[in-house]
Amino acid sequence: MDIAVQIALFHKFPCAPHSMKQHFPAHQLTGAAKQRFQQGIYRVARGGSLAELIVDGASTVLANTSNTPWGMLRCPDGSFLVVVLENQPSVDGQNSESQPRVYRYYWDADAAAAPAGSSLTVWSLENNDTVRSAITLYEAAHPGCTVNYEIALQDSAETREDAISSLNAALLAGSGPDVIILDDLDWEAYAEKGLLADLTAYVDTDALQANLAAPFLNGDGSACVLPARFSIPVICGSPEDLAAAQTLDDLAQLLLSLPARPAWDASDSGYYQPLDEPYGMGFVSVEQLLDFALEASAPALVESGVNSSAVGDVLRFVQQVGSYYGMDRYQGLISNGVVSSSDASESVAYGDGSYECFSTRNARMAWDEMLSPAYVQAVHTEEGSFSVALRPGLIEGAFLPRTLVGISVSSTRPEEAGAFVSILFGDEVQSTWQQDGMPVQAASLQNSIHRNCTDDSALSNVQALIDALKTPVTRIDSTVYDTLLENANALIAGETTLEQAQTGVENALALYLAEQN
């Protein structure tokens, strides 16, 4: 633990010197371990293996992902001291400033227990950073009010399908959560079935980025679902390569004109050695290649019913590139990436598609999911003349809405639910960077762009990307996706024809659409 932190703790809490063997440097946590710390404080009995949650992070400063956990220690009286660096936007909104704070969490036997059913319930399939940030602010603004954050797939043997079925049954029975995070759900089906309330009494839609909000607004201006965050599926390359990759078919032909990617991953020594001539793009699995296409094409598959042409276009792209790359030999390849950050900007994540272009430099072009304007700034500083463009696909202006919010019409606490949603779309949440995407509030988005893009070229590149966004793309039905992936693998292995694969996918889509009606 830093000596400055030790001195501060000794001065504030005399018990701290006797606890130094029970501390750990939280700032060294990364990935899943850091996310677990944000979820709360756990303990494991000596010799045991099950982790017991003793401090729920949802009700503490730990949940605010804009903060950096720095250290924690357990005191002899059983309480916990936690040091965090709290990030606060500067007066001009262009930078953030970190202030260290010490928090103490302890058991209060005399504290009044919350009455059963007195909490506002927020539900999501997966953990959501923006939601946790809003929970912290909501409880601070409403003393005595608590939020029960139900994460369906956390520490549960329940499958995704079972979790969704349980949610649907509860909503149809007039019970269930007050606020629903609809990420990875068919949000349009929930809205069309009248299960969600209008949000416009709690969210100023005029303050949102207009082209991002427009797809979610009804003709009368109402909105049952709104995204609090978004990301963009992108590709990167030279101006000449980007001009030659305007469609999926164009991109396939470009990739086929370049060397094929070897069937290697980060565990192979050759992976890090420069090739004489780079291959087109880096993919480590058929699933990754399919996702690449679907993230800019999925809505087209069910446009005016089952769209045979669109199904064929996606399968043909995957077959051409996957067969050329020999992806039937891509068995268990390890995914790779890197995350970098600085005090002046938001973190930048390079997944496989970017890593193999900018780090190993064996791919000629990059692809990724852009979660921050800082990604574009990073790309513009790479060696070579790289720009960022929307990923080619079958729809215009694809973006990925995140933290899709809805309020249940059967909520017994509609005003409290509305107040929570207001915080999600308010300045305090929207102005802070979260790891799950960019803010939809127009002013906060512009502040983020100008804070992260120091070059005029990067600034104009980001603005052009944002202005071109038009169509939200959400996760395709899991049964349909499984059918797509199964047929994609069979196509690449030469075990089926394109016509047969297309028929199989179309049948799955037809069944899905019939079940929705």
Predicted regions, residues:
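Repeated scaffold domains used in trafficking and secretory/extracellular systems
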Residues: 17, 26, 31-34, 66-75
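Short, well-ordered beta-strand elements
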Residues: 115-127, 145-152, 179, 224
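Extracytoplasmic "Venus flytrap"/periplasmic binding protein-like
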Residues: 148-210, 355-358, 364-365
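Hinge/lid segment of periplasmic solute-binding proteins
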Residues: 184-234, 249-250, 385-390
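Helix-loop-helix "hinge/cap" segment bordering the ligand-binding cleft or interdomain interface
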Residues: 218-336, 409-415, 497-500
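Periplasmic-binding protein-like
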Residues: 260-261, 421-446
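Extracytoplasmic/periplasmic substrate-binding proteins
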Residues: 319-413
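Long, aromatic- and glycine/proline-rich binding clefts that accommodate carbohydrate-like moieties
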Residues: 434-486, 490
